[in-house]
Curated annotation (Swiss-Prot):
The lineage of its organism: Eukaryota, Metazoa, Chordata, Craniata, Vertebrata. Residues 225-276 are annotated as: Required for interaction with TLK1 and DYNLL1/LC8. Residues 225-276, 317-347, 403-451 form a coiled coil. Changing residue 518 to N: Reduced kinase activity. Monomer. May form homodimers; homodimerization may enhance autophosphoylation and enzymatic activity. Heterodimer with TLK1. Interacts with YWHAZ; association with 14-3-3 proteins such as YWHAZ regulates subcellular location. May also interact with FEZ1/LZTS1 and FEZ2. Interacts with CHD7 and CHD8. Interacts with DYNLL1/LC8. It comes from the Eukaryota. Keywords: ATP-binding, Cell cycle, Chromatin regulator, Coiled coil, Cytoplasm, Cytoskeleton, Disease variant, DNA damage, Intellectual disability, Kinase, Nucleotide-binding, Nucleus, Phosphoprotein, Serine/threonine-protein kinase, Transferase. Changing residue 551 to G: In MRD57; uncertain significance; exhibits abnormal perinuclear localization instead of diffuse nuclear localization; mildly impairs kinase activity; reduced phosphorylation of ASF1A. This is Serine/threonine-protein kinase tousled-like 2. GO terms for molecular function: ATP binding; identical protein binding; protein serine kinase activity; protein serine/threonine kinase activity.
């Protein structure tokens, strides 16, 4: 840039230097039309050729120059070079000159022959008349700041021409405003109108020009520098904090990886220990099963023609009990025979002749025949006299001896009866143990034939331990959830590979429906469903809550029945769960309530219960359910017939209508079975027989056996549940409010006045006596 400036023509250098160092005042008349010209045109750097003073006509060059306003009478001021107005003619007027607002005080100029090697020309100090101290000082500072423009241009040669022009124009604006405020600007024949125009221009320039001074700029620069230092310090602090956080994150990541590795090792060790424990339990179960095979019995394969069937053979425990029963029976027969003989020797009462027995009559007939015949030898005489001696010995038994012998025989019979009862109780206990043994044998057989017997981990989460049971198309395994660290029950649904795709789809749809119903349920008396996932195209799994105990059906098979308090507690919990199922939206009918679907948490009848198996549940949505008639039974024939009401067996053109009263009937049947140890309808019948003989359709009234003794309130409750017509049967809401199931009402009755308590006790005693 500097090389380009030095290579310019000296006249152009003078022109460029004059643009930034000197501003002339027009000698021509005031032209109002040129007052709207921008002052920035003074510093414009157009490349267009301009008319210089050398190119002007001679008449203009020979004209005598008027004295400048700042020249005194004694002489002229410091000589100046050509004015900037001599080099430019404005488009606003025909004659050369400037507007009145462009008059500024003259400053020292460099001669046209001044070289650019001296960029800072000498500045002539001129007094500023008519200004106060601050204004004069400000004008002096503004005049002193003018030569800095060339120094900036030379110090920063890379600035473009437009930026230099803008800076020069800004300095010109400052000088114009200062000159307009001075009294010298009002001379040379200017009118008041021109002064007002100058004031307006000055105000306009003050509005667009910054008022910042060097001190303010320095202060701003210092503040900006301090702010910049603060920002840089803050940035450094943030960078250090970021580095610290990154270091902490790296440490946490390493620690997390370490903990993950440790957790994986713990999970691996847990799996190893669980598998080892499961194997030990399996071995113990198989050893016990082998021992029970000899004691309780086992299955043997028997051939019948071309087929083989399994036949049960009792063990030595049953054989010993059977032998003891045979011994007791033989002893009882012997005692009965001796009692008959003792009855023959019973002495007659006082004053009565002993009645002739059959033996005496036979002997008398024999003696009469012997008298007619002659004796042949002495042996015949002994034979004839022996019965006579026996008859005399029978007559010699006294009454005391007879009663003594009779008492002995009674005691012996009582002892045998007691032994027989003990043997019968032991036999029943062995039968229950045998049922468990048979169940365990089947479980072991199914487990050995299962494809999941080697402790696989399903879905990378559930470790299978051992088989709990097997149904028609599913297997239930006890498993361990490695993620939640809890035991669960995994139900594996396996479809038959020979099924058609349509049947598989229906089964899968049915299972998904059960999953959707069960997944939304959350009640303490309902088994929770945790998860659902697929294994392959023919199998999928549902993960359920695990309960240690057995179901109610197993308990009833072991104990036959239970007390009324225990049965009532179970029924209260079942009704509580049914109430929840009917309060949710949409309500749900379980439809398959039975002892096998009621789990005892701790295996006893005095604990908590949970309801499971929602495979046949019915959703009572608005589309299919009517509050008056109920909903159509689309799955007629499904379910357990002993626990279904009569309306489920009605056959007609349209499907039967059902409601939540189906579950109420099931509650009544379960309560009856818990109290009496048998089902109220079709106890010893199969489901096929119940269907063929219409057993449930004929169950118009329930009958109660005399034993065991049950309270009338319990019987009335069962009758309300087992009403034949569904219109007469109570629903679930009424069942939950039944007086028999409300403890506070029963307590209030029992804790009433003493007279009332006495009346209640006497009425209860009379009811018990009548029921007996």
């Amino acid at each position: 840039m500097m090389e380009e400036l030095h290579s310019l023509d000296p006249r152009r250098q003078e022109l460029l230097e004059a643009r930034f160092t000197g501003v002339g005042v027009s000698k021509g008349p005031l032209n109002s039309e040129s007052s709207n010209q921008s002052l920035c045109s003074v510093g414009s750097l157009s490349d267009k050729e301009v008319e210089t003073p050398e190119k002007k006509q001679n008449d203009q060059r020979n004209r005598k120059r008027k004295a400048e306003p700042y020249e005194t009478s004694q002489g002229k001021g410091t000589p100046r070079g050509h004015k900037i107005s001599d080099y430019f003619e404005f488009a606003g007027g025909s004659a050369p000159g400037t507007s009145p607002g462009r008059s500024v005080p003259p400053v020292a100029r460099s001669s046209p022959q001044h070289s650019l090697s001296n960029p800072l020309p000498r500045r002539v100090e001129q007094p500023l008349y008519g200004l106060d101290g601050s204004a004069a000082k400000e004008a002096t500072e503004e005049q002193s700041a003018l030569p800095t423009l060339m120094s900036v241009m030379l110090a920063k040669p890379r600035l473009d021409t437009e930026q230099l022009a803008q800076r020069g124009a800004g300095l010109c604006f400052t000088f114009v405003s200062a000159q307009q405020n001075s009294p010298s600007s009002t001379g040379s024949g200017n009118t008041e109108h021109s002064c007002s125009s100058q004031k307006q221009i000055s105000i306009q320039h003050r509005q667009t020009q910054s008022d910042l001074t060097i001190e303010k700029i320095s202060a701003l620069e210092n503040s900006k520098n301090s702010d910049l230092e603060k920002k840089e310090g803050r940035i450094d602090d943030l960078l250090r904090a970021n580095c610290d956080l990154r270091r902490q994150i790296d440490e946490q990541q390493k620690m997390l990886e370490k903990y993950k590795e440790r957790l994986n090792r713990c999970v691996t060790m847990s799996k190893k220990l669980l598998i080892e424990k499961s194997k030990q339990e399996k071995m113990a179960c198989r050893d016990k099963s082998m021992q029970d095979r000899l004691r309780l019995g086992h299955f043997t394969t028997v051939r019948h023609g071309a087929s083989f069937t399994e036949q049960w053979t009792d063990g030595y425990a049953f054989q010993n009990l059977i032998k003891q029963q045979e011994r007791i029976n033989s002893q009882r027969e012997e005692i009965e025979r001796q009692r008959k003989m003792l009855a023959k020797r019973k002495p007659p009462a006082m004053g009565q002749a002993p009645p002739a027995t059959n033996e005496q009559k036979q002997r008398k007939s024999k003696t009469n025949g012997a008298e007619n015949e002659t004796p042949s030898s002495g042996n015949t005489e002994l034979k004839d006299t022996a019965p006579a001696l026996g008859a005399h010995s029978l007559l010699r038994l006294t009454l005391a001896e007879y009663h003594e012998q009779e008492e002995i025989f009674k005691l012996r019979l009582g002892h045998l009866k007691k032994e027989e009862a003990e043997i019968q109780a032991e036999l029943e206990r062995l039968e229950r143990v045998r049922n468990l043994h048979i169940r365990e044998l089947k479980r072991i057989h199914n487990e050995d034939n299962s494809q999941f017997k080697d402790h696989p981990t399903l879905n990378d989460r559930y470790l299978l331990l051992h088989l709990l049971g097997r149904g028609g198309f599913s297997e239930v395994y006890k498993a361990f959830d490695l993620t939640e660290q809890r035991y669960v029950a995994v139900k594996i649904h396996q479809l038959n590979k020979n099924w058609r795709d349509e049947k598989k789809e229906n089964y899968h749809k049915h299972a998904c429906r059960e999953y959707r119903i069960h997944k939304e349920l959350d009640h303490p008396r309902i088994v929770k469903l945790y998860d659902y996932f697929s294994l392959d195209t023919d199998s999928f799994c549902t993960v359920l809550e695990y309960c240690e105990g057995n179901d109610l059906d197993f308990y009833l098979k072991q104990h036959k029945l239970m007390s009324e308090k225990e049965a009532r507690s179970i029924i209260m919990q079942i009704v509580n769960a049914l109430k929840y199922l009917n309060e949710i939206k949409p309500p749900i009918i379980h439809y398959d309530l039975k002892p096998g679907n009621i789990l005892l948490v701790n295996g006893t009848a005095c604990g908590e219960i949970k309801i499971t198996d929602f495979g046949l549940s019915k959703i009572m949505d608005d589309d299919s359910y009517n509050s008056v008639d109920g909903m159509e039974l689309t799955s007629q024939g499904a379910g357990t017939y002993w626990y279904l009401p009569p309306e489920c067996f009605v056959v007609g053109k349209e499907p039967p209508k059902i409601s939540n009263k189906v579950d109420v009937w099931s509650v009544g049947v379960i309560f009856y079975q818990c109290l009496y140890g048998r089902k109220p309808f079709g106890h010893n019948q199969s489901q096929q027989d119940i269907l063929q003989e219409n057993t449930i359709l004929k169950a118009t009234e329930v009958q109660f056996p005399p034993k065991p003794v049950v309270t009338p309130e319990a019987k009335a409750f069962i009758r309300r549940c087992l009403a034949y017509r569904k219109e007469d049967r109570i629903d679930v809401q009424q069942l939950a409010c039944d007086p028999y199931l409300l403890p506070h009402i029963r307590k209030s009755v029992s804790t009433s006045s003493p007279a009332g308590a006495a009346i209640a006790s006497t009425s209860g005693a009379s009811n018990n006596s009548s029921s007996n």
